[in-house]
Amino acid sequence: MSQPVTTTVEVNGFPCRVWTKGKGPKVGFLAGLGGLPRWLPFLDKLAETRTVIAPSLPGYPGATGHTELDSHLDWVLAVRQLIDKAGLAGADLVGASVGGAFAAEMAAIFPAHVGRLVLIAPFGLFDDQEPAADPWAQRRDVLPGLMCADGDKWTALVTPPEGANSVVWPIEMSRASEAAARAFWPLGNTRLEKRLGLIAAPTLVLWGDRDSLLPPSYAQKFAKGINGATRVETVPEAGHLAYLDQPDAVARAVLAHLG
């Protein structure tokens, strides 16, 4: 698996890494919990027919600046800057988990910035009748099974690769968790349901049928709230980060929607 081209942009004066690979029309990817400490097979599949641009959210691996973001509005505006500076304004956008919530915000608040939209188990809603789990309150040994149907997929994501700096790597992983918590703790509820009706982009909502973090029933809540043409698909044998569990199936569904 060849590596992407790495560039850096500044958001609020702090560096954010941008990975680019592939050919064809642009598609952006905002990663879920854990971010992108490494390039993924899922992104390689997309890159066969698309130019994949994957910017790191503030605080995620390859980026800093999350400690300057004190409100949800701060985060939304930072992501808007990131989308612009990564060259993704007007492009199709895929967002997963916490990245999915921000992708939805972009489509709602800045509709001209998003072409077609894919949301993979996005954060942003909360139903006290079917509460989401709190990923920041879990023991380390529980977390892999909460993130993926196959916990080994999560472990592989966060395990230092050969040659990684043994000091820097765990700091980046901890910082990614802290950044997501700053944006979404404790329950991931940003009142996004109030803004879903502003989304006019054609939208695909994907959800792993074994998501132990966000109930799969939330997919219908998103579909019901979004104003644009919306379709829901379930990914079999996949957990919260379905693109780790089933990269080929998720990539096929994404590419079919993007056309």
Name every feature range the model reports, one short phrase each.
Residues S2-P4, N165-K194:
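Hydrophobic, aromatic-rich cap/lid helix
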Residues N12-T64:
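Conserved HGGG/HGGXW glycine-rich cap/lid loop of the alpha/beta-hydrolase fold
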Residues F42, A201, P215-K224:
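Short alpha-helix in the alpha/beta-hydrolase fold that links the catalytic acid
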Residues I53-V94, R252:
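Active-site loop/oxyanion-hole signature of alpha/beta-hydrolase fold enzymes
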Residues A104, A108-I109, G115-L146:
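Flexible "cap/lid" loop of the alpha/beta hydrolase fold
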Residues I199, V205-W207:
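Short beta-strand/loop motif that positions the catalytic acidic residue
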Residues R210-L214:
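Acidic catalytic loop of the alpha/beta-hydrolase fold
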Residues A238-P247:
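Catalytic histidine-centered segment of alpha/beta-hydrolase-like enzymes
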